[in-house]
């Protein structure tokens, strides 16, 4: 019977799987986010979250239990020091998995797994398609058609100012170029007069 055998196999033997999850956990704790395959990210989440929960209470017993899984003093110090302070008031759900698409070499589905409390900066709006928010957005921050028209009108006004500035700059450079050309012609005439005399 397969009782108490929770977890994904991820195509590895038990010892290989244990070391893979250990290595991924150490990297996640030390770097706060890692890029890996979706299957490994999904297997890593239930492995690392109980360790983070144990790290909230810094006792010798908890340190030994976590060390049993991680086998890295640097990761233990980071987990019980900085990470446990950040997640102290969070009741669970310390990690987030974001799918990134396929890897170009073998087509494997990639994912970014990160510690939630370390992603304070929201992603910058690139202005390229999409709603600009999360997929689970409730639609509260979306623009109405009148707001979009006002934004378009203000941006077209800005572009006309930019166009007039660029026209003025072009005229100034044209005047400088013509002045340089006249000066060059005057110098050539002086040289030709000197040659004639």
Swiss-Prot record:
Keyword Acetylation: no
InterPro entries: Ribosomal_bL17, Ribosomal_bL17_CS, Ribosomal_bL17_sf
Single Gene Ontology MF annotation: structural constituent of ribosome
Gly residues: compositionally biased ranges: 127-136
GO cellular component terms attached to this protein's record: cytosolic large ribosomal subunit
Superkingdom: Bacteria
One GO term (biological process): translation
Biased composition (Acidic residues): 159-197
Region (Disordered): 120-197
Keywords in alphabetical order: Ribonucleoprotein, Ribosomal protein
Family: Belongs to the bacterial ribosomal protein bL17 family.
Subunit details: Part of the 50S ribosomal subunit. Contacts protein L32.
Name of the protein in its database record: Large ribosomal subunit protein bL17
Organism encoding this protein: Salinibacter ruber (strain DSM 13855 / M31)
Biological classification of the source: Bacteria, Pseudomonadati, Rhodothermota, Rhodothermia, Rhodothermales
